Amino acid sequence: LRGAKIPKKGEQEMKGVITEIERFSLKDGPGIRTTVFFKGCNMACKWCHNPETLSVKPQLMVYPKNCIGCGACVKACKAGARTIENGMLHYDRSVCTDCGACAQNCFTGALVMSGKEMTVEEVMSEILQDRGYYRNSGGGVTLSGGEVSTQPEFAVELLKALKNENISTAIETNLYAPWSVYESLMPFVDLVMFDIKVFDSSAHKKWTGVSNQRILENAKRIADSGKPYLVRTPVIPGVNDNEEEIGNIAEYVGGLGGAQYYELLLFNPLGESKYDALQVKNDFAGTRPTKTEGAERLEQVAKRKSGLPVRVG
């Protein structure tokens, strides 16, 4: 895991690092949901459409088109990362400390901090605003990311607070954490949504930075636990958007037994601006989602190989 220290259980006023709390989500589990996005990830998928969630540290995101050149950020920056030269605003990320002072003084949206330290109480105060919607729609709260398992102690405490309020819970995870982490989460989770991104182990390591052995082992444990679960695969052009790869994953998922359904998630190009804002390389710049006919073909393969209901999103 890259970045700041993860809060430990028992420390005074435990805090987690959260990138966003999205209300009225319809895609992160059943019913109307609030999705809490944890910052930090233990994988490095080259196609990630949320690159701001990879590091657990709060980070500055820069959107030059929103800048009006007022200079307020220059005055606020103590590191000298922001200067005005020949009437033009310049930013040197190499000396930036991501303290957030410039963003606090920017009112145009040119400078935005991604990631905020929050207590369980602070997160719950936002969640509880919509508890009536959860109850009436069969919804609840989903912990996502980044990767929820990179802040396990905070996740457990938040899940406990949710269950104390009789709110349905779900997690979205890559399943790459040690099984002991999931054992600590499972008593407070009603639904597990996990990814199997690539079936071939060497290809998985090439594209995500890690082997998939632990992921497949954890998937079997989730299935054997009896906990409700579903499986997703992001369909990435040039990586796994072919019948062989999707077929292999689907066959494995079907063999686990008990999955509610299998979902193919088409590549999302909307993260390109985030790479620019972070000033980091985007290996999938210009990539577009699999075309409709290709997606339909993969859907049929997934249905045939898994024996499960298949959704495409």
Walk through the language-model features, giving the residues of each.
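N-terminal pre-triad scaffold of radical SAM enzymes
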Residues: 19-72, 89-98
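Auxiliary Fe-S-binding modules of radical SAM enzymes
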Residues: 7-30, 235-313
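Anion (oxyanion) recognition and catalysis
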Residues: 98, 163, 223, 303-304
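Residue-level detector of anion-binding/catalytic polar loops
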Residues: 73, 168, 228, 308-309
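Conserved AdoMet/S-adenosylmethionine-binding subsite of the radical SAM
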Residues: 121-277
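Iron-sulfur cluster-binding cysteine motifs and their immediate structural context
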Residues: 46-53, 72-91, 101-117
